[in-house]
């Protein structure tokens, strides 16, 4: 009797095992999706990294690139942000933007990236808006449609953005809470004449249908670019310059072995690099110089 059971169960187990292996093989054959983290104020370093990420994904076999966005604004000018939006608009592969995870923000000029991306989604608890005057890309003003007016001066949560049709992906009330859901959202879409295949369906050992997402490759700023990005925010840059000058003056008026001077010089260099990465404004420079008089 036991032998008969083994004879019957053996092929069934082999079939389910084969289905599991087939599902794994299917996932392996799917082209990967690149995910690029974009966080903090958009400075020249981050703007360059966005453009380079698009070029990299076009050349490394990715079927799409997702920008995970969490930013409260930009310190680059409108012209530089226009170049970033143009790079997204002219990408040869689909570009998706996910404002997430929950609590993330897409404010200021960077929020307008959602208007030119192919697929856009938000996590519940995320907000977008405060875009200011809309930029123009290739002679046409970017737009969120009926949501333009509300987004320029205010902000919208997920449900409001979906209601105003500011997002380019229709989903249920849960939004897109995690990155895996963003991969599910891309599956089956045809963008820029590219049919996205990011999920493979198969039966597991219990006979239940499982969904396996394609391989995800994560990218973010390297050590030096990340350091420069950190010091390129106005508060950090000015604080480093102030500390650097204070330590240099302290070393000048006291007898020491040079530790304060060394630390001050490092802070001053980093602060100067941060200020150099910021967009210049004549009035701001005048106030900065006046502060040290």
Predicted regions and their residues:
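Non-cytosolic juxtamembrane linkers/loops
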Residues: 176-293
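Soluble extramembrane regions of membrane proteins in the secretory/endomembrane system
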Residues: 15-231
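Bacterial N-terminal signal peptides
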Residues: 2-15
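Preference for short coil/turn "hinge" residues that link or interrupt alpha-helices
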Residues: 6, 31, 35-38, 121, ...
């Amino acid at each position: 009797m036991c032998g008969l059971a083994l004879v019957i169960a053996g092929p069934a187990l082999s079939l389910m095992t084969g289905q599991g292996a087939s599902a794994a093989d299917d996932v392996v054959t799917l082209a990967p999706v690149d995910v690029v983290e974009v966080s903090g104020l958009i400075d020249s370093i981050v703007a360059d990294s966005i453009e380079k990420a698009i070029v990299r994904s076009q050349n490394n076999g990715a079927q799409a690139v997702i920008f995970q966005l969490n930013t409260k604004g930009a310190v680059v000018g409108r012209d530089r942000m226009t170049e970033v939006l143009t790079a997204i608009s002219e990408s040869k592969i689909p570009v998706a933007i996910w404002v997430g995870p929950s609590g993330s923000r897409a404010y200021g000029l960077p929020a307008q990236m959602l208007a030119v991306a192919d697929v856009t989604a938000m996590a519940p608890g995320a907000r977008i808006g405060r875009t200011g005057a809309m930029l123009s890309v290739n002679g046409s003003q970017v737009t969120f449609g009926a949501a333009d007016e509300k987004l320029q001066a205010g902000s919208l949560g997920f449900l409001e953005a979906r209601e105003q049709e500011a997002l380019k992906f229709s989903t249920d009330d849960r939004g897109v809470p995690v990155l895996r859901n963003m991969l599910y959202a891309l599956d089956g879409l045809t963008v820029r004449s590219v049919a996205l295949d990011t999920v493979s369906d198969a039966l597991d050992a219990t006979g239940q249908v499982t969904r396996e997402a394609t391989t995800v490759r994560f990218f973010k700023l390297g050590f030096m670019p990340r350091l420069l990005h950190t010091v390129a925010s106005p508060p950090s840059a000015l604080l480093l310059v102030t500390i650097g000058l204070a330590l240099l003056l302290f070393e000048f008026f006291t007898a020491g072995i040079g530790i304060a001077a060394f630390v001050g010089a490092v802070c001053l260099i980093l602060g100067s690099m941060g200020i150099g990465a910021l967009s210049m404004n004549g009035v701001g420079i005048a106030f900065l110089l006046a502060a040290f008089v």
